């Protein structure tokens, strides 16, 4: 079967024996714990510190996690033991996550401060312990898209680059483990420097590095420069593996889940109504329909979207999924 190299099944594994929806696509092994978002290491009394990462970045509700998880761990090896005990239809591998690691060691300081020497020793020891117990590696996030549900940047993004490098070096001492990260964004020259630093770290530690790679509309040719650097550095001994999609990434939006307009004037009150009432009003209230459409046609001026939250509408990138064959009509058309 296929290996799904980037999932966030860390909580779902406790209530979903099948491993959906990965299992529906021929996947027999999933890799969880990406982007630094794991449920361990963490004390049960501090579970909200790790829940908040998954709530906003990955759209997993706190209520589902509270109901579906029987918390039986503190350290990452104990978390692995808990996963091992539940029935599973597919195989799982997991990273130890930087945001969870940071809040476990530093508490609330993780959101505002650099680590002390004692903090660094504790984090490096925890990573070594996790790798020896079977963790597939260490993950972090440098992505500006990753925020907590209480509107703070995730703890790993507070960490200076040298902290990340020190932890990867500690993992390298074990002779095992992959370094996974959610990539930062920036101007081309700055990003080329960052890619070079990853290549240098891989060569220094002997650890492979992996991350998702996207082509962005605002910088359509940037990815080729990055890939040229990666190819060159891999020939020199680095081990960098990008994860790419063979098609565009898409999100399915609906009134049953969320829409890009849920925070807009009039829409926000309308969307608080029960779904059946919304449907009824759309059918019967012509004045309300005109208001909703008029507001949706205006330039967006609401809060910035993060993680799995719906983005403001870009009609040329919204497609009407009314048929199976491509191409699909854009809403702009």
Which functions belong to the PLM regions below?
Residues 15-137:
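Divalent-metal coordination cores built from histidine and acidic residues
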Residues 8-11, 35-38, 185, 215-217:
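Acidic, glycine-rich active-site loops and adjacent beta-strand->loop/helix elements
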Residues 12-16, 34, 142, 251:
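Short, function-defining helix-loop hinge/capping sites that tune catalysis or transport
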């Amino acid at each position: 079967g296929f290996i799904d190299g980037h999932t966030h099944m860390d909580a779902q594994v406790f209530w979903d024996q099948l491993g959906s929806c990965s299992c529906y696509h021929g996947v027999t092994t999933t890799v969880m714990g990406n982007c630094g978002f794991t449920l361990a290491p963490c004390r049960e009394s501090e579970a909200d510190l790790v829940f908040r990462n998954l709530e906003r970045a990955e759209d997993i509700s706190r209520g589902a996690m509270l109901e579906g998880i029987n918390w039986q761990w503190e350290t990452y090896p104990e978390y692995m033991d808990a996963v091992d005990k539940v029935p599973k239809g597919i195989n799982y591998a997991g990273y130890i996550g930087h945001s969870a690691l940071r809040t476990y060691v530093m508490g609330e300081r993780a959101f505002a401060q650099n680590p002390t020497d004692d903090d660094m020793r504790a984090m490096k020891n925890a990573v070594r312990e996790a790798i020896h117990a079977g963790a597939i590696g260490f993950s972090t996030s440098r992505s500006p898209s990753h925020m907590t549900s209480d509107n703070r940047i995730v703890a790993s993004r507070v960490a200076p680059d040298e902290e990340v490098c020190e932890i990867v070096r500690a993992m390298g001492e074990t002779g095992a483990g992959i370094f996974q990260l959610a990539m930062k964004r920036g101007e081309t020259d700055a990003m080329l420097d960052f890619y070079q630093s990853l290549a240098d770290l891989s060569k220094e530690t002997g650890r492979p590095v992996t991350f998702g790679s996207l082509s962005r509309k605002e910088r359509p040719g940037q990815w080729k420069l990055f890939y040229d650097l990666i190819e060159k550095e891999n020939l020199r001994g680095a081990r960098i593996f990008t994860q790419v999609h063979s098609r565009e990434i898409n999100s399915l939006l609906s009134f049953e889940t969320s829409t890009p307009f849920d925070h807009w004037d009039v829409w926000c009150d309308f969307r608080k109504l029960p779904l059946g009432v919304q449907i009824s009003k759309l059918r019967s209230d012509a004045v309300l329909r005109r208001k909703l459409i008029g507001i949706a046609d205006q330039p967006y001026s609401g809060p910035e979207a993060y993680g799995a939250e719906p983005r403001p509408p870009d009609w040329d990138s919204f497609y009407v999924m009314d048929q199976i064959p491509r191409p699909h009509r854009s809403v702009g058309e």
